[in-house]
């Protein structure tokens, strides 16, 4: 990937442009682990399928996202990037995108809520034809505050489980009037990004924030979807005793048959040394649970928004708050017991660490890139609704990834193809 050093002619709001050189090196390092996206970028640069298309992307501003942004620009898009989380921005990456690639970026690590919302408005002022969203904040804000822009939107792509839940609610309410691609539901996304990416990066963030030993700890994982499965798998591999809380009986059975303890949060609250929420819902850990926790219990979140842990209630129960390490805040409750909160209750893997490894984001962002291309190719043909990534694109990404990994697999023989398409062969 070649950086284009030209006079800066784009709008931006980043921490420090002098960080660009460091960001450039890290973006190029991540690119080594993203061979699928590299191949798409090469094709895009020749075919220019997104020429002139205005894209507003609301994503975590990381080295992996930078490679997606560069691929979109190579495809001819007029892309603008804002952060999807106040704590997830990597300031050097933001600087490099502006300086080296001429991409407008509005993202500051640690930005307050007012700044974040202002950046969402900047994304809408771009008058996007395509919205790449991570939690559906841009889409939701447009529907509520800028309905004048809706007619110009070709479609949106959504990266997260949380965002797809919001899109489904919008569709049910009759306010989603354009097509949305459920990138999260692609097999090459959630099987790998959600499970292996979240599992590894969540524990990475916890360890960076606390430097605790996980072996022998009782870790309570709230939620056993793909993200929860990944967190539980890696925690168990580090020697922790894992307890799962769930509301879905099928997932609870899965956890039990995976050899994990399953119980309500009301029972787990007094057992856990470390609590990790990965549900996508609000107040999974709340007032009554804090009251039951051990002294020094650690709580953190790896779901999308900072609402899974009821920090307002914890603040009301506390007589004192103090930062004891970066991203590590101690709440002292009335009576002297303490509860430790990591990363302000935001995504701990991005607040205290670097997010998912580039290798899994390679497939996730290949899905994003192909989803955008699919929306453009099918402009005017898709009714309002939520669409899965076409199976042929999902399989194409998987095949490219396997080839990059040097792995070959079998193909069906003519006899096998005939058998699975017939009904008259059975017991011989």
UniProtKB/Swiss-Prot annotation:
It is found in: Cytoplasm. One of its GO terms (cellular component) is cytosol. Pfam families: AdoHcyase, AdoHcyase_NAD. GO terms for biological process: L-homocysteine biosynthetic process; one-carbon metabolic process; S-adenosylmethionine cycle. InterPro entries: Adenosylhomocyst_ase-like_sf (IPR042172), Adenosylhomocysteinase-like (IPR000043), Ado_hCys_hydrolase_NAD-bd (IPR015878), NAD(P)-bd_dom_sf (IPR036291), S-Ado-L-homoCys_hydrolase_CS (IPR020082). It is an enzyme of class 3 (hydrolase). Binds 1 NAD(+) per subunit. Disulfide bonds: none annotated. Gene3D superfamilies: Adenosylhomocysteinase-like (3.40.50.1480), NAD(P)-binding Rossmann-like Domain (3.40.50.720). It comes from the Bacteria. May play a key role in the regulation of the intracellular concentration of adenosylhomocysteine. This is Adenosylhomocysteinase. The lineage of its organism: Bacteria, Bacillati, Cyanobacteriota, Cyanophyceae, Gloeobacterales. The gene is ahcY.
């Amino acid at each position: 990937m070649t950086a284009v050093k030209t006079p800066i002619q784009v709008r931006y709001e980043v921490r420090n442009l002098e960080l660009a050189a460091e960001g450039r090196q890290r973006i190029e390092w991540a690119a080594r682990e993203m061979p699928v996206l590299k191949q798409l970028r090469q094709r895009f640069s020749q075919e220019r399928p997104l020429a002139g298309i205005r894209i507003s992307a609301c994503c975590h501003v990381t080295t992996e996202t930078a490679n997606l942004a560069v691929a979109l620009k190579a495809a001819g898009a007029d892309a603008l990037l804002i952060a999807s989380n106040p704590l997830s921005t990597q300031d050097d990456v933001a600087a490099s995108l502006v300086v080296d690639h001429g991409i407008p970026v509005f993202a500051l690590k640690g930005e307050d809520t007012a700044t974040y919302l202002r950046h969402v408005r900047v994304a809408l002022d771009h008058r996007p034809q395509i919205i790449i969203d991570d939690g559906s904040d841009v889409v939701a804000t447009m529907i509520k505050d800028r309905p004048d822009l809706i007619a110009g939107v070709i479609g949106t792509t959504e990266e997260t489980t949380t965002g797809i839940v919001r899109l489904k609610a919008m569709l049910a309410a009759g306010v989603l009037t354009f097509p949305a691609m459920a990138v999260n539901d692609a097999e090459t996304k959630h099987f790998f990004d959600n499970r292996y990416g979240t599992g590894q990066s969540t524990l990475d963030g916890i360890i960076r924030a606390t430097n605790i030993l996980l072996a022998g700890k009782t870790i309570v994982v709230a939620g056993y979807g793909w993200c929860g499965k990944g967190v539980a798998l890696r925690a168990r591999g580090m020697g922790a005793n894992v307890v799962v809380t769930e509301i879905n009986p099928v997932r609870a059975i899965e956890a039990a048959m995976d050899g994990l303890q399953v119980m309500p949060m009301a029972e787990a609250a007094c057992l856990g040394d470390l609590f990790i929420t990965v549900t996508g819902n609000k107040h999974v850990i709340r007032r009554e649970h804090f009251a039951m926790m051990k002294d020094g219990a650690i709580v953190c979140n790896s779901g999308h928004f900072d609402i899974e842990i009821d920090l307002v209630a914890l603040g009301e129960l506390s007589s004192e708050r103090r930062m004891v390490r970066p991203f590590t805040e101690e709440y002292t409750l009335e009576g002297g017991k303490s509860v430790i909160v990591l990363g302000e209750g935001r995504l701990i893997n991005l607040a205290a660490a670097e997010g998912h490894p580039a290798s899994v984001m390679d497939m996730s962002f290949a899905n994003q890139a192909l989803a955008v291309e699919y929306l453009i190719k099918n402009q005017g043909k898709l009714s309002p609704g939520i669409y899965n990534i076409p199976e042929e694109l999902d399989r194409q990404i998987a095949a490219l990834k396997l080839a990059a990994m040097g792995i070959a697999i079998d193909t069906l023989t003519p006899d096998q193809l005939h058998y699975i398409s017939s009904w008259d062969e059975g017991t011989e």
